[in-house]
């Protein structure tokens, strides 16, 4: 069974833990208890393949930013979560994305942009803004509500599909060359 290491990142209070717990335990946690770092595992079937999701729910607070590099190194894919009622959390997404790319030393890393709290009446980040940013980044955009469970499975499952696509692309690049494999022998002088 394939295991996928997913990391949920975003500013404090955007609903990272609520999304993760909704996926894992099917219930909404409405009290806010800032996370330092929590890990969850769940077996699911995505596109006919049984797989194990290893989800790291991270701290959004700035005082825990020193821990970020470590979890970014180990993650295979990232949910970039912002709250639709917080323009600041949306602005922070670019910083998270750049940090992930720097730590992973890669231009393309599997990511999904997630606009959470879509059940709220007032939005400070419009759908079009988020779609435009996702398009610029070349990543999918999913709207979610941890409260109503809208889009929760879709967000995590889309990230798994992005990881699979990334692995397929890297596999093809590695096999593409038509040049014969030449080995050079070292000579000690």
Curated annotation (Swiss-Prot):
Ras proteins bind GDP/GTP and possess intrinsic GTPase activity. Plays a role in eye development by regulating cell growth, survival of postmitotic ommatidial cells and differentiation of photoreceptor cells. During larval development, mediates Ptth/tor signaling leading to the production of ecdysone, a hormone required for the initiation of metamorphosis. A lipid is attached at residue 186 (S-geranylgeranyl cysteine). GO terms for molecular function: G protein activity; GTP binding; protein serine/threonine kinase activator activity. This is Ras-like protein 1. Keywords: Cell membrane, GTP-binding, Hydrolase, Lipoprotein, Membrane, Methylation, Nucleotide-binding, Prenylation. It is an enzyme of class 3 (hydrolase). GO terms for cellular component: membrane; plasma membrane. Its EC number is 3.6.5.2. Alternates between an inactive form bound to GDP and an active form bound to GTP. Activated by a guanine nucleotide-exchange factor (GEF) and inactivated by a GTPase-activating protein (GAP). The modification Cysteine methyl ester is found at residue 186. It holds the Pfam family Ras. Coiled coil: none annotated. Belongs to the small GTPase superfamily. Ras family.
């Amino acid at each position: 069974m394939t295991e996928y290491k997913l990391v949920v990142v975003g500013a404090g209070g955007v609903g990272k833990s609520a999304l993760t717990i909704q996926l894992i335990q099917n219930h909404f946690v409405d009290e806010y208890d800032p996370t330092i770092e929590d890990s969850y595992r769940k077996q699911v079937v995505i596109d006919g393949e049984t797989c194990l999701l290893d989800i790291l729910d991270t701290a959004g607070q700035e005082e825990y930013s020193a821990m970020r590099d470590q979890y970014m190194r180990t993650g295979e894919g990232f949910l970039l979560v912002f709250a639709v009622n917080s323009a600041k959390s949306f602005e922070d997404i670019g910083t998270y994305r750049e940090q992930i790319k720097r730590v992973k030393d890669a231009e393309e890393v599997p990511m999904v942009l997630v606009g959470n709290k879509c059940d709220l009446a007032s939005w400070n980040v419009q759908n079009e803004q988020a779609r435009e940013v996702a398009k610029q980044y070349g990543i999918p955009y999913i709207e979610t509500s941890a409260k109503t469970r809208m889009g929760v499975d879709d967000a995590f499952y889309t990230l798994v599909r992005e990881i699979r696509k990334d692995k397929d692309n890297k596999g093809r690049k590695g096999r593409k060359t038509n040049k014969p494999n030449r080995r050079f022998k070292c000579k000690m002088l």
